[in-house]
């Protein structure tokens, strides 16, 4: 129902898969030996007309997996609930990190007064 394909350099795999199937393809550009993955990113986002590939950020397989779950959740409702739970966990982690940063800033202000 959805394929995640990674590629470094000219990143042929995502584009080749997209040209051969009607299944949604998510391309993940990977860092290679040169250009720090920018070449891979350009290869994936510059697909010709009629060969769509959803492009993620460089080395962003995690986001590709989340995006694939979002696509699959349209047909498989149980995945939607799992995604909502996952996003709630992420939100709680961000709030905890924000609270920690604010506490650290308060302590630093106290040291310089």
PLM features per residue range, with description:
Residues 7-16, 35-38, 61-65:
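Short glycine/serine/threonine-rich phosphate/pyrophosphate-binding segments
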Residues 30-34:
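Short, acidic/turn-prone active-site loops that include or flank metal/cofactor-
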Residues 1-29:
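Glycine-rich phosphate-binding loop
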Residues 37-113:
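C-terminal binding/interaction regions
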């Amino acid at each position: 129902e959805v394929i995640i394909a990674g590629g470094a350099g000219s990143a042929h795999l995502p584009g080749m898969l997209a040209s051969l199937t009607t299944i949604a393809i998510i391309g993940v550009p990977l860092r290679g030996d040169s250009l720090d993955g920018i070449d891979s990113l350009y290869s994936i986002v510059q697909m010709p007309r009629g060969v769509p590939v959803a492009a993620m950020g460089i080395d962003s397989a995690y986001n590709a997996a989340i995006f694939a779950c979002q696509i699959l959740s349209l047909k498989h409702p149980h995945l939607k609930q799992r995604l909502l739970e996952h996003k709630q966990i992420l939100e709680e982690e961000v709030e905890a990190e924000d609270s920690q940063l604010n506490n650290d800033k308060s302590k630093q202000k106290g040291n310089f007064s």
